[in-house]
A protein has these predicted regions:
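Structured mid-to-C-terminal alpha-helical surface segments
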Residues: 1-53, 65-69, 75, 81-332
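Betabetaalpha-Me/HNH-type nuclease active-site subdomain
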Residues: 62
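Glycine-rich beta-strand-to-loop/alpha-helix junction loops that act as flexible
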Residues: 55-59
Length: 332
């Protein structure tokens, strides 16, 4: 991928444009997809912390497993907390709620300092050496655990951000995970132009992501009326709809211990007073939000649909499938 990254702008522009025409996507999406894959290749093969990270989240569902047909713009990474100076099992030590909250805040602050003082400067140095131009990487004040890479772009699209966000957190679980190949759309169409059309990335298994999404929806089902729903949250309902219509559902259903681990992890490191994680289990799982938030999610989904490049199911169809999934989980 480095050879393509170093092409002159006109050649890259032609490659992305021709790929977009073949795939029925916008030029800007094809371009950004390439840079997402390039960045993953760098992070997992040439970055100093290549052995201390794992890939998770929505982008992994589309790029590593082909489970969703949604263009996901961000790269979610798990950072080994030992990089921050913790022992392997230290975060799991028994603590009071107050002390656990203090530990979680401390781990967050250490992550922010690491990203600001060590990780981002190293990434800038490495990428400037590879790309031979001044690389624009930065951390936004209101999101200190996200490193932003503003790639040199040839196309504009108001529907997507012209940057790649590396969302990096240490308080996340690595297992189960496996190495999976990812391929840019441009390499799928014009593989002969690439010396390296794909790259192997350590990726969290989708059955864990399935339970992560289920517990997100369970929490949202209990969101208080006076608490605003985050933007772009309809993506979790779409993603779960897709996974529920794939073999991943059976794999997840066969591993209820993994659901327990996901719930325990969230309750310890992402405590939420109203989430009712103790009820996130067969028999008491709840996945359907309030009527008020259904309306909010429908509107959110309408704004997100242009990021779906495959079938675009109505949100009512998605909710019906989620309700069916809720019933299935509660009879396990």
């Amino acid at each position: 991928m480095r050879d393509i990254a170093k092409l002159n702008e006109n050649d890259k522009k032609a490659l992305f444009h021709n790929t977009a025409a073949k795939m029925g996507m916008t030029d800007a999406i094809i371009e950004k997809d390439f840079w997402v894959c390039y960045m993953l290749d760098y992070l997992f093969h040439r970055c100093a912390w290549k052995n201390n990270i794992a890939f998770k989240g929505g982008t992994s569902l589309s790029k590593s497993y082909g489970l969703i047909e949604r263009f996901s713009e961000d790269i979610d990474l798990i950072l080994d907390w030992r990089v921050l100076g913790y022992e392997k099992d230290e975060p799991w030590a028994d603590r009071s709620n107050t002390k656990q909250d203090a530990f979680n805040k401390e781990a967050g602050a250490k992550t922010e300092a690491f990203l600001r003082n060590e990780f981002m400067p190293a990434v800038i140095t490495d990428l400037q050496s590879e790309l031979s131009y001044d690389v624009n990487c930065y951390i936004e004040d209101d999101d200190p655990q996200t490193v932003v890479f503003a790639y040199n772009r040839s196309f504009d699209d108001s529907a997507i951000l012209p940057v790649i966000r590396l969302e990096i957190g240490a308080l996340a679980a690595w297992t189960p995970a496996e190495k999976k190949p990812i391929t840019p759309y441009a390499a799928e169409q014009y593989g002969r132009l690439f010396k390296q059309p794909s790259t192997d990335i350590l990726t969290v298994l989708p059955k864990r992501t399935f339970w992560e999404k289920v517990t997100i929806l369970h929490r949202e089902a209990y969101r208080p009326e006076n608490s605003a729903l985050p933007t772009r949250y309809s993506r979790h309902y779409y993603d779960l709809y897709c996974m529920a219509n794939s073999p991943v559902k059976a794999e997840a259903f066969a591993d209820l211990d993994l659901l327990d681990k996901v719930v325990c992890f969230k309750d310890k490191f992402y405590r939420c007073s109203w989430a009712r994680y103790d009820e996130a289990k067969p028999g008491t799982m709840k996945l359907i939000p309030s009527e008020k938030n259904i309306k909010v999610l429908k509107d959110d989904y309408e704004h997100m649909k242009n990021m779906i490049y495959g079938e675009k199911p109505d949100f009512d169809v998605i909710l019906n499938a989620v309700k069916q999934l809720e019933d299935e989980i509660n009879t396990l």
